Amino acid sequence: MSKEEFPSEKNLDKEENTSKPKKAVKKEAAKGEETKKNNENQKLAKEIADLKEKNKDLEDKYLRSEAEIQNMQNRYTKERAQLIKYESQSLAKDVLPAMDNLERALSVEADDDVSKQLKKGVQMTLDALVKAMKDHGVVEIEADGVKFDPTLHQAVQTVAAENDDQKDHVVQVLQKGYQYKDRTLRPAMVVVAQ
């Protein structure tokens, strides 16, 4: 037998050493790949859970933002309607002192024909102004003889009531009050019986 037919002890050791580790290496490699896959799967599962949580937060923020925008639009619509409804309020409030002055001018006695004609012109001017104010929603607050209402009347003075029916009622109007649509422009200044 030649040397080639019988492997030497050294060669046998090499073959045995190489054949065992190959199986072990394959097992370890398979185990390593499995561990690597498990780690990757865990990472991916964690990433998916994080993304789902982030998506949930973003969806919540989106819904809240959408609701806030809707609320802002509703508030804007209401405010705009209020502005349109009460756009003449400041003008009406500014005209009230002029109406008061015209009424004071009418309370003066007219002695001669010129004064009477002047008074008649002032009355016509006041009537036209009152009509224009009514046409735009400004009306005088009823005060004389009615029950005192703090939302419409301002009590400037109180007097003793002559009878029980007169208690808490307006007995004298010192200055007329006016309402514009459903708002009080100026409360009537009144004397109330107690």
UniProtKB/Swiss-Prot annotation:
The keyword Cytoplasm applies. Keywords: Chaperone, Cytoplasm, Stress response. It holds the Pfam family GrpE. CDD domains: GrpE (cd00446). InterPro entries: GrpE, GrpE_coiled_coil, GrpE_head. It is found in: Cytoplasm. PANTHER family: GRPE PROTEIN, GRPE PROTEIN HOMOLOG, MITOCHONDRIAL. NCBIfam families: PRK14140.1 (NF010738), PRK14162.1 (NF010759). Belongs to the GrpE family. This is Protein GrpE. It comes from Lactobacillus acidophilus (strain ATCC 700396 / NCK56 / N2 / NCFM). The gene is grpE.
